[in-house]
Amino acid sequence: MVNKYVILLFAIIVLFIGGCSSAGSETGMLQGKVTIGPISPVERPGETPTIPCEVYEARKIMVYDERGNKLIQQIDIDCDGRYRAELKPGIYTIDINRIGIDSSTDVPQKVEIKSSTTVRLDIDIDTGIR
């Protein structure tokens, strides 16, 4: 009788450990750099203005299902313009939440996330300020 419980306990532990160890490898990474500009109507050639953190924080990277219909995740952009997120393997449509007249020729774009790999997507946002 004791042997049955020991075997059952051992089987449960093996299943639990096996389930935990494979979970980490079942995701991929999406990361990139966002550039935003211009941020003022007059920018002199050769000058690179400092982008305030609030400009990045107001925008998000939007991850939709493959068709672009269902929002899967919103990704924050840090004060240096970088973003990073773990996603399950699959095909996603990546876009931005547009503020005012923001535009980008880089998105929307489909990306394929594979297990244990990183996809890089850099996005240039034109604020439309002239």
Question: Positions of the model-derived regions?
Answer:
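Short, acidic Ser/Thr/Gly-rich low-complexity loop/linker segments typical of extracellular
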Residues: 66-80
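Bacterial signal peptide processing site
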Residues: 21-23
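Short, ordered, surface-exposed loop/turn motifs in non-cytosolic proteins
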Residues: 36-68
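A short, amphipathic beta-strand motif
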Residues: 28-36
